[in-house]
C-alpha cells in the first residue's frame, strides 16, 4: 500500500517539516481513516496575506485564518469510502505558517505539531468532515487527536526548529 498518495507541496514560506515527512504523515492519516485507493492532494504553506486573499475570495471573510481546505468532492457528510477507478483527487489544503507559528507559541508547542494539527484538520474537511455545531466540532477534534497520535514519534523529533 506504500506510495498510494501523490502529494503536491507548495512552499510560499519556509517549512520546518520536510517534504518526505509531510508525505509520510498524510499516508499514515489516510490509512487511519480507511482510505486505501490511490489519491492526490496538494498542501500549500503560505503567508497571512495570501490566505487572507483566499479567505476573502472564497469565504467572504476579509481576515487571515490558520487553514483553508478546498475539497474536490462536495459532500455534507464524511465521504463513504468506496473503491474507485483511477486516482481520487481529494483537494487542496492551505495553511498560514505565520498564524500557525503564533498559535504554536501561544499554546507552548512546537510549530511542527501545530502544522500537523492544521493539516489533519484540513484533510478531514477534504474527506467531508465539518463542524457546523459543537457536537460535530468535538467529533472532529477527537479524530484530529487520533490522527496526531498516529504520528506521535515524528512529532517528538524537532524538525530543525527551536522548542
UniProtKB/Swiss-Prot annotation:
Report the sequence similarity comment from the record. Answer: Belongs to the endoribonuclease YbeY family.
Q: Where's it found, cell-wise? A: Cytoplasm
Q: What is its EC number?
A: 3.1.-.-
Q: Which GO terms describe its cellular component?
A: cytoplasm
- What is the annotated role of this protein in its UniProt record? Single strand-specific metallo-endoribonuclease involved in late-stage 70S ribosome quality control and in maturation of the 3' terminus of the 16S rRNA.
Gene it is expressed from: ybeY
**UniProt main location, coarse:** cytoplasm
In terms of InterPro entries, this protein maps to: MetalPrtase_cat_dom_sf_prd, YbeY, YbeY_CS
GO: which molecular function terms?
metalloendopeptidase activity; RNA endonuclease activity; zinc ion binding
Q: What keywords appear on the UniProt entry?
A: Cytoplasm, Endonuclease, Hydrolase, Metal-binding, Nuclease, Ribosome biogenesis, rRNA processing, Zinc
Q: Does the keyword NAD apply?
A: no
Upper taxonomic classification of the species?
Bacteria, Bacillati, Cyanobacteriota, Cyanophyceae, Synechococcales
Keyword Protein biosynthesis tagged: no
Q: What is this protein called?
A: Endoribonuclease YbeY
Record SUPFAM superfamilies:
Metalloproteases ('zincins'), catalytic domain
Q: Which GO terms describe its biological process?
A: rRNA processing
Cofactor comment: Binds 1 zinc ion.
Taxonomic superkingdom: Bacteria
The species is: Synechococcus sp. (strain JA-3-3Ab)
Q: Which cofactors does the annotated protein need, by name?
A: Zn(2+)
Listed binding positions for Zn(2+) are: 121, 125, 131
Amino acid at each position: 500500500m506504500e506510495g498510494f498518495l501523490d502529494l503536491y507541496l507548495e512552499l510560499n514560506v519556509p517549512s520546518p517539516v520536510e517534504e518526505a515527512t509531510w508525505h509520510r504523515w498524510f499516508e499514515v492519516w489516510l490509512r487511519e481513516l480507511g482510505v486505501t485507493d490511490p489519491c492526490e492532494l496538494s498542501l500549500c504553506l503560505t503567508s497571512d496575506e495570501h490566505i487572507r486573499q483566499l479567505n476573502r475570495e472564497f469565504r467572504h471573510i476579509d481576515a487571515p485564518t490558520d487553514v483553508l481546505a478546498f475539497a474536490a468532492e462536495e459532500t455534507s457528510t464524511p465521504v463513504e469510502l468506496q473503491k474507485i477507478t483511477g486516482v481520487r483527487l481529494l483537494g487542496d489544503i492551505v495553511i498560514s505558517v505565520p498564524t500557525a507559528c503564533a498559535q504554536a507559541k501561544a499554546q507552548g508547542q512546537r510549530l511542527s505539531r501545530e502544522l500537523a494539527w492544521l493539516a489533519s484538520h484540513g484533510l478531514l474537511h477534504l474527506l467531508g468532515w465539518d463542524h457546523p455545531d459543537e457536537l460535530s466540532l468535538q467529533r472532529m477534534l477527537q479524530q484530529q487527536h487520533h490522527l496526531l497520535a498516529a504520528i506521535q514519534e515524528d512529532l517528538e523529533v524537532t524538525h530543525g526548529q527551536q522548542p
